[in-house]
Structures are given as structure tokens and as C-alpha cells.
Amino acid sequence: MQNIKLGFIGFGNMAQAMVKGLLLKEVLPADQIYACAKNWEKLERTTGSFRVHPCHDAREVAEQADLVIVA
């Protein structure tokens, strides 16, 4: 699964828990994960703590990712 780019539409508690698990188990590197959310400032903080890519909207996530999870 190392070559897959993963996207999240919504980056709340559930998405963050999934990302944390993926990163801890080294399933994917952070630079292959994209996320968007309604609150841009909060998204920047949370994606920054995981070092994943923040996206402005769902369209951008879909354009970047191979697989998208709606969380």
C-alpha cells in the first residue's frame, strides 16, 4: 500500500485516529495523505501536527488522492 495516496474529506476525531494508526504502523508516509475540512485554521493545525497535506476542498482531495475516505 506504500504507493497509494490517501485522502480524507473531513478531518475530525475519526479521521485523525485513522491517520495516527496508519502513521504509527508505517502503512503510509505522511506525505501521501491529504485532508480537507470546513474550518481551515483548525485543519492547518491538525494536519500540521501529523505532517499531512491540508487541502482547501473535497475536489482538491479527490484530485490528489487515489483513495478517498469520507470521515
Where are these regions (language model features)?
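NAD(P)+-binding Rossmann beta1-loop-alpha1 motif at the extreme N-terminus of oxidoreductases
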Residues: 1-64
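N-terminal Rossmann-like NAD(P) cofactor-binding module of classical short-chain dehydrogenase/reductase
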Residues: 68-69
